[in-house]
Amino acid sequence: MKDIFQNAFLGSLVGDALSMPVHWYYDTSALDRDYGAIDCYLPPRNPHPDSILWRSRYHPINELADILHDQAYFWGQKGVHYHQFLEAGENTLNYQLAIELYRWIILRGGYNSREWLEHYIEVMQTSGWHDDTYVEEVHRNFFTQYARGNKPMNCAVKDPHIGALSQVPALIAGLDALGVPNPDDLTEIVKSHVALTHNHPESIEAAGLLVQLLCDLDEGIPLRQSIANRAVKWIGASTLKDWEQRPDREVVGRKVSTACYLPESMTASLHFAWKYAQDFDKGIQANARVGGDNCHRAAVVGGLLGGTLGVSADWLLELKAMEALRCDKPL
């Protein structure tokens, strides 16, 4: 196995777990007041001042679409934190699925998209499989389509959100563990995997870019050079050089949105990866502190910085996923 791909996966998990308590904070004053510097894993607290769960609704059309289970009780209530029952150092649902994907690939000894969708459906329909309150719209839409009788391969929606990338580092790490190092093969598999749920050109293209950047790191190409060469459509090197001189909240919050929508969420992620190309800790902390969809940006920020710099043991000691990643236990 290649350290770069394995560390990229771990970096994405660390970045998500660090961001988790301030996920979808848009009022940065409230973020600072509630959580301070965010230089270590912290537990979430209610109330969440920017939570929109009070106006979120999901009514499964039948039992096949029931993926909220006991958490449905909290939907429609004000101030509920999206991840209220997670512990400090624990990952959000999309990254718990990423961990499951990684273990599933290794324990099976291979990857098959149809069989993965069957496993995805099984775990999401299992009450208590996870303890996260919020389930993203892409999952709700997928299971609505599935409950209507559509085949799993035909349940994807056109979803242009950076959450599409949350499983990419895990998928690459799993394939790498099985000896699938060819960049072209990795890119094709990753794009097809993302399209299973987020079948939108922006999501698929962003996934392809992340694969290319990680493969460049594996070939010894410096991160900034790779971004400058590969990410021209998303942002130019001259702009990145300008932005690295500015406060992060001026860049991500004013120049580009902190929200989940592509392409701006990818541009924001590339800013952090560029600016903090020599400092993993500062990069994931800066990403967390601007709020918004920091958890899903962590697939890019934590993934690229973890891949190029590695992840220190200090972050891994308190990362709950380290136990979940063990492959000596059955799925």
Predicted segments, located by residue:
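Structured, active/binding-site neighborhoods that engage oxygen-rich ligands
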Residues: 1-331
